[in-house]
Curated annotation (Swiss-Prot):
One of its GO terms (biological process) is urea catabolic process. GO terms for cellular component: urease complex. It comes from Bordetella bronchiseptica (strain ATCC BAA-588 / NCTC 13252 / RB50). Pathway: Nitrogen metabolism; urea degradation; CO(2) and NH(3) from urea (urease route): step 1/1. PANTHER family: UREASE. Its EC number is 3.5.1.5. InterPro entries: Urease_beta-like (IPR002019), Urease_betasu_sf (IPR036461), Urease_subunit (IPR050069). It is found in: Cytoplasm. This is Urease subunit beta.
């Protein structure tokens, strides 16, 4: 074994199996690139991103942990979101939830 090496079982690793997902269109109407990380509550992302925030409440990007999606100015992109897991409580970000999701 090499120091720092990670050994995994053979086959593909499936992420977020069985969790609700949704696909939404997002447009960056700002003048600067915006990056959103894998575990950021998507409904509270930068206000220059235009999308259905009510629909996205309780969801995050369906991408591997530690990754991010970049939205260039004027760019329209479709992203897949996945429901937040665990106790489904959200704190911080823009402070719009601050507790349990409904």
């Amino acid at each position: 074994m090499i120091p720092g090496e990670i050994l995994t079982e053979p086959g593909q690793i499936e992420l977020n199996v069985g969790r609700p997902t949704l696909t939404i269109a997002v447009v960056n109407e700002g003048d600067r690139p915006i990056q959103v990380g894998s575990h950021y509550h998507f409904a509270e992302a930068n206000n220059a991103l235009v999308f259905d925030r009510e629909l996205a409440t309780g969801y995050r990007l369906n991408i591997p942990a530690g990754n991010a999606v970049r939205f260039e100015p004027g760019m329209r992109r479709t992203v897949e979101l996945v429901a937040v897991g665990g106790e489904r409580r959200i704190f911080g970000f823009q402070g719009k939830v601050m507790g349990a999701l409904k």
